[in-house]
Amino acid sequence: MTPDEFLSALTDFDIKLSDKQIEQFERYFELLVEWNEKINLTAITEKNEVYLKHFYDSVAPILYGLITDQPVSILDIGAGAGFPSLPMKIIFPELEVTIIDSLNKRINFLSLLTEELGLENVTLLHGRAEDFGQDSNYRATFDFVTARAVARLSVLSEFTIPFLKKNGNLLSLKAAQFEEELTDAKKAIAILGGKFIKEIAYELPNGDERHIAVIEKKKETPKKYPRKAGTPAKSPIK
C-alpha cells in the first residue's frame, strides 16, 4: 500500500487527511525506520508494508466506527512503536492518548516521535500495566483501552479491563479469529466486570484477515485485579 493508496483507502471511509496529517504519517515512517536500527521496534520496515500493516491496520477502530472524532481518553497497552493509538491520534487530534510500555527505550522513541509530530495530549508511562492498574490515578479512568496483538484475551482482559470506566470499551485487535480465545476468556471477562459485545471481522486491502473484539465494562473490577506483575500471564483467570 503506497502512501497515495493509503490516502485513497481512507477516503473510501470519508476520511480526508490534511497536508499536515500526510506529513505526520511520512515523518512517523521515517523515524520508525531510523530508530528501528537502534532498538527493535518492528520487523516491518518496507514503506508500503508499514502503511498497510501498521498505519492502515491501526486506524481500523476509526474506519469501523468504534472511535469517533470526540475528545475521549484512550489507553494503549504494549503499544511498542505507538500502534494502534498514535495513527488514530494523527487522524483525530482531539483524542487523549496514554501509552504504557515496559521498555524505557520504546518510551524514549515515543517521546521523540510525539514531539516531532507535534502531537499534544499524549502521556507516556514507563512500567507494567499490572502496576498502573492498581494506581487510582489510572484505574477506572479511560473510555477505551486498545491492544494490538499483545496477549491472549484471558490474560489481556486482566491487563486492560481494570483501567476502563464503567461502560468503557476494550478494543482488542488481532489477525486471527477470537472464537477459541473468547471461550477461554469468558470467565475472566465476567470476573473482571466485562461483557463481550461483538467481534468485527474485516480484511486489509491486500486481503489479510483482521478482527477486533469489543468488550464493554459493565461493573467495577474487584480490587484484587490486576494481580502483581507477571501473574496474569503465568496464571490466567480460569
Curated annotation (Swiss-Prot):
UniProt EC number: 2.1.1.-
Residues bound to S-adenosyl-L-methionine: 78, 83, 129-130, 148
Disordered, as annotated region: 217-238
Stored Pfam families: GidB
Main location class: cytoplasm
One GO term describing the cellular component: cytosol
InterPro entries: rRNA_ssu_MeTfrase_G (IPR003682), SAM-dependent_MTases_sf (IPR029063)
Keywords annotated in UniProt: Cytoplasm, Methyltransferase, rRNA processing, S-adenosyl-L-methionine, Transferase
Coiled-coil spans in chain: none
Record localization: Cytoplasm
A GO molecular-function descriptor: rRNA (guanine-N7-)-methyltransferase activity
Superkingdom of source: Bacteria
UniProt xrefs under SUPFAM superfamilies: S-adenosyl-L-methionine-dependent methyltransferases (SSF53335)
PANTHER family per UniProt: S-ADENOSYL-L-METHIONINE-DEPENDENT METHYLTRANSFERASES SUPERFAMILY PROTEIN
Family the UniProt entry places it in: Belongs to the methyltransferase superfamily. RNA methyltransferase RsmG family.
Function of the protein: Specifically methylates the N7 position of a guanine in 16S rRNA.
Protein name per its UniProtKB record: Ribosomal RNA small subunit methyltransferase G
Organism: Lactococcus lactis subsp. cremoris (strain MG1363)
Taxon lineage: Bacteria, Bacillati, Bacillota, Bacilli, Lactobacillales
Gene behind this protein: rsmG
